[in-house]
Swiss-Prot record:
GO terms for cellular component: cytosolic small ribosomal subunit. PROSITE patterns: RIBOSOMAL_S2_2 (PS00963). Gene3D superfamilies: Glucose-6-phosphate isomerase like protein, domain 1 (3.40.50.10490), Helix hairpin bin (1.10.287.610). GO terms for molecular function: structural constituent of ribosome. InterPro entries: Ribosomal_uS2, Ribosomal_uS2_bac/mit/plastid, Ribosomal_uS2_CS, Ribosomal_uS2_flav_dom_sf. GO terms for biological process: translation. HAMAP family: Ribosomal_uS2_B. Belongs to the universal ribosomal protein uS2 family. It holds the Pfam family Ribosomal_S2. This is Small ribosomal subunit protein uS2. Keywords: Ribonucleoprotein, Ribosomal protein.
Length: 294
């Protein structure tokens, strides 16, 4: 593992990557409840712990973000392979899927399969199989029977689920970007074994020694995760001369829609109606003296 990188880098003369005000508005500085903290993250946490949750020092957060941004940009400029990983929940899966496709890099949003990196040869076999099946379906669809087409489509769908995001990988990635290194511990562990640099959003419960480029941040709230992961994707976009979404934009142009939790409708059971319905279903007539079935 390389040494922890916490020193800010020299930035260009252009506008700041993102303002402290916007970081605060998106609650990127709000960590986890104090009892979950990892003492090794203490360097990034406000010393005056006045809140129920630990809070990150915003200036340190911005410096770390700029350092990570510059490194991601450098890797992309050198045609390095970058892999985004986010499997924690439906929101993160959709987010990672969208941003990776936006900047045309590999991604994994389904369950991390053991050996994805450490046994890359086996992964390559699955990727080659998927690519050949897609090619076969495109070229020979008219010559296949309806049943053969259906079976082929099902096999492609199964492989796409796990390998669709990495089918462009021709070699091991040069950089791994994860939204939560605690949840994605298997991916981080494999990257560490192979000495692949890791960029990660590290909450207060993270062991920073496992991550090369730490971004101390709230990775449990959608608006924070969305802002920071998109900024890392913008580093790739800038390197490829593609449009960026949030990087170096004024605050008023950074709009993030916060998803609302949809509560399941309450089912109110009317016991009287329930008994009545049950009686009707069983075709039962109640008599004070005897219970008979009509």
């Amino acid at each position: 593992m390389s040494e922890l990188i916490t020193t800010p880098v020299e930035t260009t003369a252009k506008a700041e990557l993102v303002s402290l005000a916007k970081l605060g508005e998106m609650r990127t500085h709000v960590g986890m409840v104090k009892r979950y903290w990892n003492p090794k993250m203490g360097f990034f946490i406000e010393p005056e712990r006045k809140h129920n949750n630990d809070h990150f020092v915003l200036e340190l957060q911005r410096q770390s973000l700029q350092t990570a941004y510059n490194y991601v940009k450098e890797v992309a400029q050198n045609n390095g392979q970058i892999l985004f990983v986010g499997t924690k929940n439906d929101y993160v899966k959709k987010l990672v899927n969208n941003i990776a496709k936006r900047v045309d890099v590999a991604f994994i949003t389904q369950r991390w399969l053991g050996g994805t990196l450490t046994n890359f040869k086996t992964l390559s076999i699955s990727i080659n199989k998927l690519n050949k099946l897609v090619e076969k379906q495109a070229e020979n669809a008219a010559d296949l029977t309806k049943k053969e087409n259906l079976m082929l489509s099902r096999e492609i769908e199964r492989l796409e689920k796990f390998f669709g995001g990495v089918k462009s990988l021709k070699r091991l990635p040069n950089l791994l970007i994860v939204d939560d290194p605690v949840y994605e511990k298997n991916a981080v562990a494999e990257a560490n074994i192979l000495r692949i640099p890791v960029v990660a959003l590290c909450n207060t419960n993270t062991n920073p020694e496992l991550v090369d480029f730490i971004i101390p941040a709230n990775n449990h709230q959608p608006q924070s995760t969305c802002l920071l992961m998109n900024l890392l994707a913008d580093a790739v976009a800038e390197a490829k001369a593609m449009p960026t979404m949030f990087a170096y934009k004024p605050d008023e142009e950074i709009q993030i829609e916060i998803p609302q939790k949809q509560e399941a409708p309450r089912q109110v059971v009317n016991r009287a109606n329930s008994k009545q319905i049950t009686s009707q279903r069983l075709n039962i007539t109640r008599n004070p003296e005897v219970l008979t079935r009509e």
